[in-house]
Regions:
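N-terminal binding-site loop/beta-alpha segment at the start of enzyme catalytic domains
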Residues: 1-77, 280-281
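Beta/alpha (TIM)-barrel catalytic core signal, keyed to glycine-rich beta->alpha loops juxtaposed to Asp/Glu
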Residues: 7, 117-281
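Acidic (Asp/Glu)-rich catalytic clusters
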Residues: 10-11, 45, 67-75, 98-107, ...
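Short, well-ordered coil/turn segments that N-cap beta-strands
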Residues: 15-19, 47-50, 74-77, 106-110, ...
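Active-site mouth loops of central-metabolism enzymes
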Residues: 22-34, 81-91, 115
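Short, acidic/polar
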Residues: 30-43, 89-104, 124, 151-152, ...
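A short, structured active-site edge motif that brings together acidic residues
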Residues: 76-88, 111-115, 145, 168-170
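Active-site groove signature of glycoside hydrolases
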Residues: 104-120
Length: 281
């Protein structure tokens, strides 16, 4: 891991980068594969070694692209993938993980997430995750798109408190997790992984964001990422299929924003004053 990238600790004590790379949509167009591989390798080169993918992304082709990109560099990477909820039965979880590992060309996942709540009992999924840990096929497991009530239900099942992370939709325009979910996870030393950290680009034309970013000779995307990196226990995983955009994203760690400017951003993107149901994309 690059020493310049801030780190976040898992419950196990392992430190992982607070800024990684998402791979949603990668693998959908064969013509873009070469550049996608270059982007993943650029992320590794600059210390953004947490690579997030899922069996859902491009029907597994995203995992295949990641596998090609990390060939010969597996030990440099913190590899995350996710399982469809309808695959997350006792036997289905094992089988889905093995398929993901085959596509990734890896013998293990560092973190395996249940993509969202589904019909399979949490007890079954958790037991299967723990079995995968025993088999050495995953190091840790976690969840995605779980709100506080989901997390409390999870912690009530056997071994549910071994959950290592929760990946949710969180960015300047969707600050609902700050009201209760983020504090809940922080109290348990559980990282929150923020997907769509720049709202798929939709927040980048906000006047306050543009104005403040210019004052720091930064881009609006860098400032939006810096907002998340300021939060304890939060990991941002922006997706980028272009190496130059990966470099831009990495620049977010250099920003030191004043309290006055954070207050201006709070006025433009108000923090929640009440419970907001967790949103999903």
């Amino acid at each position: 891991m690059n020493d310049d990238i801030p780190s976040v600790s898992l419950p196990s004590g392992k430190d992982i980068p607070a800024l990684g790379l998402g791979t949603w949509n990668m693998g959908e167009q064969r013509a873009g594969e070469t550049q996608e591989i270059r982007s993943i390798r650029k992320a590794i080169d600059v210390g953004m070694t947490l690579i997030d993918t899922a069996e859902m992304y491009a029907d597994g082709k995203s995992e295949e692209v990641v596998g090609k990109a990390i060939t010969g560099r597996r030990d440099e990477v913190f590899l995350v993938s996710k399982i469809y909820p309808w695959n997350a039965s006792a036997a289905g979880t094992i089988e889905a993980c093995e398929r993901s590992l085959a596509r990734l060309g890896s013998d293990r996942l560092d973190l395996y997430l249940l993509h969202w709540r589904g019909g399979n009992p949490l007890e079954e999924t958790v037991a299967a995750f723990e079995k995968l840990k025993t088999q050495g096929k995953i190091v840790d497991w976690g969840v995605s798109n779980f709100d506080v009530d989901d997390m409390e239900e999870l912690f009530d099942v056997p071994d549910g408190n071994k959950c290592a992370a929760n990946q949710v939709l969180y960015n300047l325009s969707r600050r609902g997790p700050e009201f209760d979910l983020l504090p809940w996870c922080q109290e348990r030393s559980m990282p929150v992984m923020a997907y769509s950290p720049i709202e798929q680009g939709r927040i980048l034309d906000n006047h306050a964001l543009i104005h403040i970013a210019k004052a720091y000779q930064a881009t609006p995307a860098q400032l939006a990422l810096a907002f998340l990196l300021e939060r304890d226990g939060v990991i941002a995983i922006p997706k980028s299929a272009r190496p130059e955009r990966v470099e831009e994203n990495r620049g977010a760690i250099e920003l030191e924003i004043t309290e006055e400017d954070w207050a201006t951003l709070d006025a433009a993107f108000p923090p929640p004053s009440r419970k907001i149901a967790l949103e999903m994309l």
